[in-house]
Amino acid sequence: MKKINLVVFNEPYWDKGLIYSQNILPLLQLVKTGKYSLDIISFTSLPFFLKCYKEIQKTKEELKEYGVVIKNYPVLFYPTRFMLLRTIFLPFYFLNVYLFIKYLNRKDKKTNDEIFYSIRSYQAALGFLKFYEDKSRIIFDTRTDWIEENINVGNFKPDGATVKFWRNAEKQMLLKFRKTLFISDLFRDAVLKRHSIKLDENKYCLVYNPINYEHFHSVQNRDQDDNFLYTGSLGHWNNISIYLDFFLKVADKMPSSKLIVCTGSPIHKIEPTFNLPKYDAIRNRVEIHYSVPYSELPSFYARCTYGLQLMSKKDTRVGVKFIEYIAANLIPIVNTNVMGAAALARKYEIGIVLDDETEEVDSIVNRLEQIKQNRKNSKLAEFRKITDLNEFANILKPIYS
């Protein structure tokens, strides 16, 4: 039996959020085949661990039913989620992880089991790059262009020492690790290009974010009102103003429609913009729902026809929300800044891309109506095969073999 160790770095795997849905649940599909076992190794800071102890224990019990073992390695509060891992913090970081990774290294040498490490983040991957000897066991699951993201939001200086360090580490990870997973071909191409690395599809694998389609089919869709939906955080990448501006533009031409927003962002970050006088005309047609549990999301999706992902800065990823929209039978509307999603919307004919901010509203509304009528002719079934969680064992088997 093959063994997979999912490595999580000071992130809440127990909150049923992204790590649970995008890392744990897909690997559970392999466990269910009877040919794999799964351990979760979490480097968790002591304050974080103590604060969330009850939730952690509950998740342990739930996953125990599948034979999943969770190992929490307690470390001091260190610069990952709450303090960015700049070069000045590296000695502190290495001090925290060194003994744990060396322990894993010695333990793995004594077994004949076929072992893989699925590394969740750049921060976790760095420790294994430095201290774990057998790099052929490591699958690096990038998820996001972490370095570029921190440059774009101003956390890292483009030519600073921190970026130079991480660029060099990234190249070593790409070359030395067994495989690296990317969630869009544009993301993969951009990362390989900046390091002048030739594409090898067996080593640099394309794996889209998986979604449980059945979860979003639990409530029947009622899209007669042509409502628009946005789900997710509102901050650096997705600003509430860009969604309000879009709806303000089309609202008069679609008088029965609403804009529905489900977000985990705090109300004090949204209300000042939402209450601006420019949005007076649409305010009573906008619903904002805070901290909606994942189990309740299908009821909001079911009220909508279109799913929005409009960003002010360029990004090569394909976000979870884009695939959730597809799973719920919504029509995604993205702009060209959401490059990975825009490419898929065109390739599979499953959404529309707003190429030009000056596009006339009549043109936008006509395109929305056209794709709504023609969606049965799209390549939705083909897209589902590569994104449905329940089909994901077939995608992951060649990677973890």
Show which residues each predicted segment covers.
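Carbohydrate-associated surface elements
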Residues: 186, 210
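A charged, aromatic-enriched C-terminal amphipathic alpha-helix characteristic of glycosyltransferases
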Residues: 355-363, 369-401
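Membrane-proximal helix-turn-helix segments that form the acceptor-binding/catalytic region
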Residues: 26, 95-106, 126, 140, ...
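Conserved donor-binding/catalytic core segment of Leloir-type glycosyltransferases
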Residues: 6-8, 181, 220-238, 243-251, ...
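Nucleotide-activated donor-binding/catalytic signature segment of Leloir-type glycosyltransferases, i.e.
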Residues: 263-265, 271-296
